């Protein structure tokens, strides 16, 4: 409505071109954790207040991280498909998570919870974050070192101009051929073309992806 004072949005784009049709707009409630889909510059310029739902999905996302990690690492979905087609699991049972080096990129609420769970699995946990925190048992290291040495790399960073495309061909090339990449953060922080190439060429062992550059829908012909 063009005369609305308050607008509630979820994870759909809410650009200036739409907001400017709402001259009475005073408050945008983002029913979502991230708010990069809202034109914050326009809101600041016009005195429009914006709030998000930080923390509502922390537990759920952290759970999903380990669902994907175990699925990819232990080949659960792959083996399910093979067995249903009459094959066997011989030679395809993946490694255990315990004892692996678990690298977390981003130490916000979700990243911090993921680190605690990884420790409970018996992993050696390392983290890269611009803002370091005092988390017992976690070593903070540079991103390149994390990528080179981790068995699991889990992304937990917001989408910003600096993080868009952060995990591209150059960064993926640093990862071990036995490593897996988990992205439950934002789709655009990973270069999908570069990731697909690395997977198809066997340069990394696997990936668990919950987010893409375009949502929704899953675009036809997408490399992943």
Language model: regions and residue ranges:
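Rossmann-like dinucleotide/phosphate-binding beta-alpha-beta segment
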Residues: 91-177
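Short glycine-rich, flexible loops that bind phosphorylated cofactors or substrates
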Residues: 13-17, 36-37, 160-163, 189-190, ...
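Rossmann-like dinucleotide-binding domain for NAD(H)/NADP(H)
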Residues: 50, 178-180, 184-224
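Short, hydrophobic beta-strand segments that form beta-sheet elements in well-ordered domains
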Residues: 6-9, 28, 122-129, 208-210
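An N-terminal-biased, well-structured beta-alpha scaffold segment characteristic
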Residues: 1-51, 148, 168
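Short, Asp-centered acidic motifs that coordinate Mg2+ and/or phosphate
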Residues: 5-6, 27, 152, 180, ...
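Phosphate-binding beta-alpha-beta segment of Rossmann-like dinucleotide-binding domains, i.e.
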Residues: 46, 54-101, 113-120, 127-128
